[in-house]
């Protein structure tokens, strides 16, 4: 399985160690991970501020950039939920959806539901994001 690691813009700018830790975790679990260097923002800040055209352009870019991966995994529930729930509306005329549905996962969901390790060789202080509980993604 080939995974495209989606590192949201705010994590890249403010918490780069989260991106590095995400990469290390996935590779240590035996996942083939690629980090597309050309990735930018998923478009959530623009969509939230009402700039739909700008958000759509970023969504189309992200869809094209991550089209070749079996899964897209990101360490931000907020951005993952935006892609799952916001992209179908933004991209209603866009034919090829690379990330929609089961292809994009929040990293903890992906490790638990897809990779399914029997053990982790480390302590894992994990907190489930409250956003996952209030979104449609929580039902999946």
Regions found by a protein language model. Name each.
Residues 2, 127-129:
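Residues that mark the start of a beta-strand
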Residues 2-99, 135:
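Cofactor-cradling patches in redox/metallo enzymes
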Residues 37, 104, 118-119:
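Generic preference for hydrophobic/aromatic residues in regular secondary structure cores
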Residues 98-114:
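Short, flexible loop segments at boundaries between secondary-structure elements
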Residues 117-127:
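Short, structured loop/turn "capping" segments at alpha-beta junctions
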Residues 133-140:
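Conserved small/polar residues in nucleotide/adenosyl-binding loops
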């Amino acid at each position: 399985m080939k995974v495209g690691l989606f590192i949201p813009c705010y994590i890249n700018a403010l918490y780069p160690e989260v991106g590095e830790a995400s990469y290390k975790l996935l590779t240590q679990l035996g996942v083939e991970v690629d980090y597309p260097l050309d990735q930018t923002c998923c478009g959530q800040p623009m969509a939230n501020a009402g700039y739909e055209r700008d958000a759509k352009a970023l969504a189309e870019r992200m869809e094209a950039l991550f089209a070749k991966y079996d899964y897209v995994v990101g360490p931000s529930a907020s951005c993952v939920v935006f892609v799952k729930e916001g992209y179908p509306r933004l991209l209603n005329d866009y034919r090829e959806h690379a990330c929609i549905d089961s292809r994009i996962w929040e990293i903890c969901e992906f490790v638990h539901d897809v990779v399914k390790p029997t053990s982790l060789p480390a302590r894992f202080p994990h907190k489930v994001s409250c956003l996952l509980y209030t979104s449609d993604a929580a039902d999946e």
